[in-house]
Curated annotation (Swiss-Prot):
It comes from Homo sapiens (Human). Its main location: membrane. It holds the Pfam family 7tm_4. Odorant receptor. CDD domains: 7tmA_OR10A-like (cd15225). PROSITE patterns: G_PROTEIN_RECEP_F1_1, G_PROTEIN_RECEP_F1_2. Belongs to the G-protein coupled receptor 1 family. The chain crosses the membrane at residues 37-57, 66-86, 111-131, 151-171, 208-227, 248-268, 282-302. InterPro entries: GPCR_Rhodpsn, GPCR_Rhodpsn_7TM, Olfact_rcpt. One of its GO terms (biological process) is sensory perception of chemical stimulus. One of its GO terms (cellular component) is plasma membrane. This is Olfactory receptor 10J1. Gene3D superfamilies: Rhodopsin 7-helix transmembrane proteins.
């Protein structure tokens, strides 16, 4: 519970000595007529995302042909995406059918913590997968030696640790603020919408959020970009056309996921303040939080031959 006072002209419309104990999401308040349709669409996407990621994790675990570093990282990404989806979608769906209950400050902080943790973990897992593709293409003879079990675990733990550290930093900085309003203009407890409810100037918090966003998006993007520059330069040196096609094919799924993931995340968290409507900002958030997690199983199922073959073996009951 936080006690806040009138602060400057910007707070004139807010009550003095307001006691805030919970928040109410207002993300879809302007879509009354479309709420049932949106519920059906998001429910379908939710089920597909969970089913797709669970199938990928199960297939990788059961099929010995997929017990390689590349698919180890894919299973970790699918697991992270599954939890990420569970953090946001259930409450969002309940709000669309009028069953949304106020969320306590502790509940909001918890949701924000897991959202940030797994969102950033996903970014660095994609970076680790980029390094894995670099080693596979540029140093194939030593691939299994370099990408040994110890290094793979270290890369995954590193990604998770960065996510945890950033989440603790962000959540602590946001929930130290005094709040004077309880209506969150969003469909979950994201950092910026919650900060807007504060009675005091949040410039320092906004600068901190921007710096962290740059570090956890631009740095991984840069590393992936460097990896693919080296990968492409190596592939172009391959003499046979068939060899080049095969090398490109091993990277196509990862590159597709990387482009969409980082593009959506950058638009959502690195774009400057503008006169965009709330609906426009929410559309970007929906794309990043609902559509992107579905992309991983769809791309790797439709574009990756080894995963498709493993699914065929699973259906045919021919696991190794």
């Amino acid at each position: 519970m936080l006690l806040c006072f009138r602060f400057g002209n910007q707070s004139m419309k807010r009550e003095n000595f307001t006691l805030i104990t919970d928040f109410v999401f207002q993300g879809f308040s302007s879509f009354h007529e479309q709420q049932i349709t949106l519920f059906g669409v998001f429910l379908a996407l939710y089920i597909l995302t969970l089913a797709g990621n669970i199938i990928i994790v199960t297939i990788i675990r059961m099929d010995l042909h997929l017990h390689t570093p590349m698919y180890f990282f894919l299973s970790m990404l699918s697991t992270s995406e599954t939890v990420y989806t569970l953090v946001i979608l259930p409450r969002m769906l309940s709000s669309l059918v009028g069953m949304s209950q106020p969320i306590s400050l502790a509940g909001c902080a918890t949701q924000m913590f897991f959202f940030v943790t797994f969102g950033i973990t996903n970014c660095f897992l994609l970076t680790a997968m980029g390094y894995d593709r670099y080693v596979a293409i540029c140093n194939p003879l030593r691939y299994m030696v370099i990408m040994n079990k110890r290094l793979r675990i270290q890369l995954v733990l590193g990604a998770c640790s960065i996510g945890l550290i950033v989440a603790i930093t962000q959540v602590t900085s946001v929930f130290r603020l005094p709040f004077c309003a309880r209506k969150v203009p969003h469909f979950f407890c994201d950092i910026r919408p919650v900060m807007k409810l504060s009675c005091i100037d949040t410039t320092v918090n906004e600068i901190l959020t921007l710096i962290i966003s740059v570090l956890v998006l631009v740095v991984p993007m840069g590393l992936v970009f460097i990896s693919y520059v080296l990968i492409i330069s190596t592939i172009l040196k391959i003499a046979s056309v068939e060899g080049r096609k095969k090398a490109f094919a091993t990277c196509a799924s990862h590159l597709t996921v990387v482009i969409v993931h980082y593009s959506c995340a950058s638009i959502a968290y690195l774009k400057p303040k503008s006169e965009n409507t709330r609906e426009h900002d929410q559309l970007i958030s929906v794309t990043y939080t609902v559509i992107t997690p579905l992309l991983n199983p769809v791309v790797y199922t439709l574009r990756n031959k080894e995963v498709k073959d493993a699914l065929c073996r699973a259906v045919g009951g021919k696991f190794s």
